[in-house]
Amino acid sequence: MALTKEQTQHLYHKLLDMQKELSGEKKETESMTEEVGELSNGVDNHMADHGTLVTDRMTDQTVKEIDRELLEEVNRALQKMKDGTYGVCEKTGQEIPYERLEAVPYARMTVEAQADVEDDLETDAPSYEREFHEQVKDLSNKETIDQKSSQTYEILDREQDSK
């Protein structure tokens, strides 16, 4: 069943909100990166501080890349709405159920088609490529970032206590 006008409007506004949020986060992350850069300029920090700064910068870059890709997906979905092709699976041509679009408004495929693509990626991709995709998923998960950060601090504390 095709999306109703109300459903389409709801999803359109949801995509616009995501677009604004992702654009706003980009500016916030850029200013945070500048602050980190200022902290490291001309100040002789402890080696652990340098390691933390490098890790923070790498995490920021990865998060920026994920946000950039997500913003592209959101923009693509908005363009599909204008073109009249929104909600149609790119792989099968079937309509994407409203429930899926409600959960993932920028979805380009049905759940089944997406699972097939991901299965193909897992079987076709070299192991290092799968590991990279898993790392990106981990880095996009705030709980994982917090956990890795706390583990890093625990290790640094133990190293400093042992001296």
Swiss-Prot record:
Residues of the signal peptide: none
Keywords of the record: Metal-binding, Stress response, Zinc, Zinc-finger
Protein's recorded name: General stress protein 16O
An example Gene Ontology molecular-function term: zinc ion binding
Annotated source species: Bacillus subtilis (strain 168)
InterPro entries: DnaK_N, Znf_DskA_TraR, Znf_DskA_TraR_CS
Compositional bias segments (type: Basic and acidic residues): 19-30, 127-146
Positions of the UniProt region annotated as Disordered: 19-55, 115-163
